[in-house]
């Protein structure tokens, strides 16, 4: 006899024992409601990671309107991958990259979030050279 409930299948053997086979595609629920202190989103560490990526990738970059969409996508993916390497397993990372041309004009940016102030956080970094400016915001939201 076998019964299946949303990714779990229970099988009864002839001895009356049952085993649980979990669907390998779904993450295991650990019932952790808060991250331990060492695994909390640390804005200073994340900001250093962002700054390192921007410095390496944009130090000699020139603004070109045709190339900027691909560059913003590549930067956001690189930063997101670096943040995953830091061990934020239970966090959903959102990385926003804005690149603009240096023309002597001003730019105002804002973000609002509805989240748990105890577990979720964000940081941002700004990079500028003679040709362009880049603003990166990284948001970490804890999975319950």
From Swiss-Prot:
Q: Which GO terms describe its biological process?
A: cilium assembly; intraciliary retrograde transport; regulation of cilium assembly; regulation of intraciliary retrograde transport
Tell whether Secreted is among the UniProt keywords. Answer: no
Alphabetical list of InterPro entries matching this protein:
Tctex-1-like (IPR005334), Tctex-1-like_sf (IPR038586)
Keywords, alphabetical:
Cytoplasm
Q: Which GO terms describe its molecular function?
A: dynein intermediate chain binding
What are the GO cellular component annotations? axoneme; centrosome; ciliary base; cytoplasmic dynein complex; dynein axonemal particle; interphase microtubule organizing center; spindle pole
What Pfam families does this protein's entry cite?
Tctex-1
The keyword Cytoplasm is assigned to this record: yes
Where in or outside the cell is it found? Dynein axonemal particle
- Please report which protein family the annotation says this sequence is part of: Belongs to the dynein light chain Tctex-type family.
Q: Indicate the quaternary assembly.
A: Light chain of the cytoplasmic dynein complex 2, a multisubunit complex composed at least of eleven different proteins. The cytoplasmic dynein 2 complex consists of two catalytic heavy chains (HCs) and a number of non-catalytic subunits presented by intermediate chains (ICs), light intermediate chains (LICs) and light chains (LCs).
Function (record text): Acts as one of several non-catalytic accessory components of the cytoplasmic dynein 2 complex (dynein-2 complex), a motor protein complex that drives the movement of cargos along microtubules within cilia and flagella in concert with the intraflagellar transport (IFT) system. Required for proper retrograde ciliary transport.
Q: What name goes with this protein?
A: Dynein light chain Tctex-type protein 2B
Q: What is the source species?
A: Mus musculus
């Amino acid at each position: 006899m076998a019964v299946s409930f949303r990714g779990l299948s229970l099988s009864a053997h002839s001895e009356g024992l049952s085993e649980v086979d979990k669907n390998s595609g779904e993450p295991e629920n650990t019932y952790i409601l808060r991250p331990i202190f060492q695994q909390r989103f640390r804005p200073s560490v994340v900001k250093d990671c962002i700054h390192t990526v921007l410095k390496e990738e944009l130090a000699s970059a020139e603004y070109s309107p045709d190339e900027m969409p691909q560059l913003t996508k590549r930067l956001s993916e690189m930063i997101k991958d670096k943040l995953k390497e830091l061990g934020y397993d239970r966090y959903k990372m959102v990385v926003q990259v804005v690149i603009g041309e240096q023309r002597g004009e001003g730019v105002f940016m804002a973000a609002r979030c509805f989240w748990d102030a105890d577990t979720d956080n964000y940081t941002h970094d700004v990079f500028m050279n003679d040709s362009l400016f880049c603003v990166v915001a990284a948001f970490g939201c804890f999975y319950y």
